[in-house]
Amino acid sequence: MSVEQSLLGKETQYPTSYQPDVLFPIARAQSREKYAHIEGITQGKDWWHVFEISWLNAHGIPQVAIGRITLPASSPNLIESKSLKLYFNSLNFTQFDSTQSFIETVEKDLSAAAGAKVELTLFQVDDLEISKPQGICIDDLMPERLEQHPDATLLKLDESDEEIEVELYSHLLRSNCPVTGQPDWGTVFIRFKGKKPCYRSILAYIISYRQHNGFHEQCVEQIFADIWQNLQPEKLMVYATYTRRGGLDINPCRVSDLTWMPKPIRLARQ
């Protein structure tokens, strides 16, 4: 299905009965065509936090939780966010015999939409803790050049020719939803092993996304691919934690080496 057929940016009625068919898959293949040869572009996970989960227990009493969805980057489809919100709304008045029954139903429906096994972990509403970023924040550096759209030529190696392993992060990631034009804000983590990159050039590159139209997952994959091709690290991880919209936040992560998969976190802006 094409994104133009989705419910993004359109007035919709919120379902009050279970409707798994509202889920809208979007194929990953088209946006990945020019990165198909990049090692790691399909390695990783998309973590979603769902803050508006509710269903009825066997006695008809409302239950609430925070959910973490884990969707493999190797899945043929991602799931459009508004359709996911509507799907969870459709469960608000549906009775389940147990919490496990609720989890199994959601996992079955999301796996069918994604075309791969999707996992749901539930947290009590007070239990999903806020983490602090680890690594070197590059936001106070001064880039040599600024662009308003992604420009891989901004990426440079440091003049020292030093071999390093480092984790950098920036809170300055901004891009736009390709359908509604609404801004998406995020923190991006970059773990890098290889010849030392110029940190100012990486910041300039991140800033260049400010007027770019792309889904969260696509932006992370483009960042990963551009760094991989232009800075040629031995190992690379790119992980973005986007702020919440409509009760959901999306956190894509791509890695060249599966041993570099981080644990999912939740930051203060989420």
Swiss-Prot record:
Catalytic reaction annotation: 7-aminomethyl-7-carbaguanine + 2 NADP(+) = 7-cyano-7-deazaguanine + 2 NADPH + 3 H(+)
Domain of life: Bacteria
An annotated Gene Ontology molecular function: preQ1 synthase activity
EC nos: 1.7.1.13
GO biological process: queuosine biosynthetic process; tRNA modification
Location of this chain's protein in the cell: Cytoplasm
Annotated GO CC locations: cytoplasm
Positions with a binding annotation for NADPH: 81-82, 245-246
Keywords on record: Cytoplasm, NADP, Oxidoreductase, Queuosine biosynthesis
Enzyme class, UniProt record, top EC level: oxidoreductase
Pathway: tRNA modification; tRNA-queuosine biosynthesis
Pfam families the UniProt entry points to: QueF (PF14489), QueF_N (PF14819)
Keyword Cytoplasm annotated: yes
Binding site for substrate: 79-81, 216-217
InterPro entries in UniProt: GTP-CH-I_C/QueF, NADPH_dep_7-cyano-7-deazaG_red, QueF, QueF_N, QueF_type2
Active site: 177 (thioimide intermediate), 184 (proton donor)
Similarity-based family: Belongs to the GTP cyclohydrolase I family. QueF type 2 subfamily.
Reported function: Catalyzes the NADPH-dependent reduction of 7-cyano-7-deazaguanine (preQ0) to 7-aminomethyl-7-deazaguanine (preQ1).
Subunit structure: Homodimer.
Annotated protein name in UniProt: NADPH-dependent 7-cyano-7-deazaguanine reductase
Lineage of the organism: Bacteria, Pseudomonadati, Pseudomonadota, Gammaproteobacteria, Moraxellales
